[in-house]
Amino acid sequence: MTQLSVNVNKIATLRNSRGGSLPSVLKLSELILDSGAHGITVHPRSDERHITKQDVFELQEFLRTYNEKITKLGISKKEYNIEGEPSERFLDLVLKAKPDQATLVPVKPGEITSDHGFQFADQKTFSTLKPIVEAIRKEGIRVSLFMETDFTFYDQVVALGAERIELYTGPFAHAFDLSEEKGKEIFTDYQRAAIEANKLGLAVNAGHDLDTNNLRVFAKLPYLKEVSIGHRLMAQSLVDGLETTVKSYLKVLSLGNETE
């Protein structure tokens, strides 16, 4: 089954909008995991507008103790995924927090959310990423790169030593919002990308604006290892509750190729 990692940035955004400690990122992360999610994702930006450095390390400690408890019961370990730009700031954070996975994402100044994958046509991209990826891998941390469906440069991901790609699903989700037919049309690009990535030995993650509607289609993606979902999951939880929402996402993912 495709793994679900829940991005908790929006919880931190709500907390920071008022100040103080409510809602609690830790308590709601625990509820998310207790509801069946396979991991927690954070994207700590340099301006700390949602997830802060303190959050990163508090979640690290929380997951350590949570995993100690559940593994004794025979339950599989929950993963910690930290996303961020390839910078010295982010590298330092990752090497100290030691997550299970570090997802490197290109960041533009002033952007509200990630909206594009790495472009290897620019040779600076490879040279910037190489030392970052090597330093993270040296610590035994899995590396994933945020990519689009153009698989021309997937061999560069392999050359860097990254083990996974995370497909940017914004274009698919936005097409699906217009109509399911349009979503299915663009979904073929993701199918080809996943197949080519697998041929190169890369595992495939995906994320951005996925929800229980468009996942009925996207969960069919070949070789889909993990989805990272935040904004739309949190939006749905305002209506249905967090536990119910997480379980509904897990149900759609579990159907996989059984969905139409």
Curated annotation (Swiss-Prot):
Main location: cytoplasm
Keyword Chloroplast: no
Classification via Gene3D superfamilies: Aldolase class I (3.20.20.70)
Localisation: Cytoplasm
SUPFAM superfamilies documented for this protein: Pyridoxine 5'-phosphate synthase
Keyword Transferase among record annotations: yes
Gene Ontology CC annotations of this record: cytosol
Reactions catalysed, as given in the entry: 3-amino-2-oxopropyl phosphate + 1-deoxy-D-xylulose 5-phosphate = pyridoxine 5'-phosphate + phosphate + 2 H2O + H(+)
Residues engaged in binding 1-deoxy-D-xylulose 5-phosphate: R45, H50, T113
Site residues (Transition state stabilizer), renumbered to this chain: E166
Pathways involved: Cofactor biosynthesis; pyridoxine 5'-phosphate biosynthesis; pyridoxine 5'-phosphate from D-erythrose 4-phosphate: step 5/5
Active site: H43 (proton acceptor), E83 (proton acceptor), H208 (proton donor)
GO BP: any one term: pyridoxine biosynthetic process
Positions contributing to 3-amino-2-oxopropyl phosphate binding: N7, R18, D209, G230, H231
A single MF term (Gene Ontology): pyridoxine 5'-phosphate synthase activity
Record keywords, A-Z: Cytoplasm, Pyridoxine biosynthesis, Transferase
InterPro entries named among the record's database cross-references: Aldolase_TIM (IPR013785), PyrdxlP_synth_PdxJ (IPR004569), Pyridoxine-5'_phos_synth (IPR036130)
E.C. numbers: 2.6.99.2
Function noted in UniProt: Catalyzes the complicated ring closure reaction between the two acyclic compounds 1-deoxy-D-xylulose-5-phosphate (DXP) and 3-amino-2-oxopropyl phosphate (1-amino-acetone-3-phosphate or AAP) to form pyridoxine 5'-phosphate (PNP) and inorganic phosphate.
PANTHER family: PYRIDOXINE 5'-PHOSPHATE SYNTHASE
Family: Belongs to the PNP synthase family.
Self-association state and partner proteins as the record states: Homooctamer; tetramer of dimers.
Protein known as: Pyridoxine 5'-phosphate synthase
Gene of this entry: pdxJ
